[in-house]
Amino acid sequence: MGSKADFLASLPEQIRSPNNCWAEKLPGVPYNYGYRPSLAAGASFIVLFAFALIYHLTLSMRKKRWVSVALSYGAFVELIGWVGRTWGSQCPYNQHAYLMQIVTLIIGPVFVTAALYILLGQLIQIFGPESSMLSSRMYTIIFLTCDWVTLIIQAIGAAMAASAQRTRKNPTPGTNTMIAGIVFQLATMAVFAGLAVDFLRRISKSASSARSIGDVDGGSVPKQYYSVLTALFISLVCIVARNLFRVVELAEGWTGHLMLHERYFVALDGLLMVLAVWIFIVLDPARLVDENRDLFTRPADVERVIHKGSLEVEEAEHGGRGSYGAKEYSASQQAY
């Protein structure tokens, strides 16, 4: 008889089936979570993520925006995770509910970070190559590849850890794999944050250059784009904070203080992820950008708004030769 079968046979009859729904605490047999999950918390997060899913999914179908598609996936995965925890609140010994929430809630943020990477890549296309150290295409390829690597590592680690927990084996290999995936994601996000700050610096500098030569119209970035960047940075900070919490929580182990007290998970995972997704409902890039897209439909308009100052300064310094012309920018606009 295999070890898993031996383990199941040793369990009390009430929870021997993986599909059991025994709610009462059994003497000497801890709940899968170390506690009984809160029904109120689970139901609240189901409502919040379900609304976000419906909003972003509807937007992705209407606007055909990849940012909305990625946010839809993120909201959906988080929703499934909290459905699992709500199920676990009624059936705290149920193995399927436990596995369901462990795998989905560890990988959910990966889809939201994908939305951030796509969003900044699109902003780079709008403002032109002078606004970034990397081309928008290379930017998207590099960061989305890192995101997929993160997703695979974390999913494998979560499955390993959940399986070990379910059969009361050593979960350390799976836990360490999960930590490695989160740390890799944090490293990727640190590089992303640096490039995002550089992007903000570059577009602000271009606008300042325009003002310095008396171009009032071209001396400012439309406020809608600052709103989009505000949403991006808020979401980024939330996910970084959530990831740091999960690293500390997992490093403490499955019997650590953070792991055994649900309030930390609710505040530092659930609430932070709600904010990371909901900020794009309050400050929706598709709505803000599309409503003001007429500012960026013609190369001449783009030069007037953001590039005119930097181009004229460069022409003065290099004998009338600007480094970036309307023809090249028109090509980048068509790619958006």
Stretch-by-stretch model annotation:
Residues 146-149, 158-187, 191-228, 241-244:
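Membrane-interfacial loop- and helix-cap regions that link adjacent transmembrane helices
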Residues 50-57, 106-132, 148-162, 186-204, ...:
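Cytoplasm-facing ends of alpha-helical transmembrane segments in multi-pass membrane proteins
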Residues 2-109, 113, 121-125, 131-141:
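Membrane-proximal first intracellular loop
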Residues 98-110, 154, 171-189, 225-285:
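Extracellular loop 3-seventh transmembrane helix
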Residues 43-49, 53, 68-75, 102, ...:
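Residues within membrane-spanning alpha-helices of integral membrane proteins
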Residues 56-65, 90-94, 123-136, 196-228, ...:
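Juxtamembrane membrane-water interface segments of multi-pass membrane proteins
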Residues 28-30, 164-172, 254-256:
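Membrane-interface helix termini and inter-helical loops of multi-pass transporters
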Residues 1-18, 201-224, 285-336:
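Intrinsically disordered, low-complexity terminal tails of fungal membrane proteins
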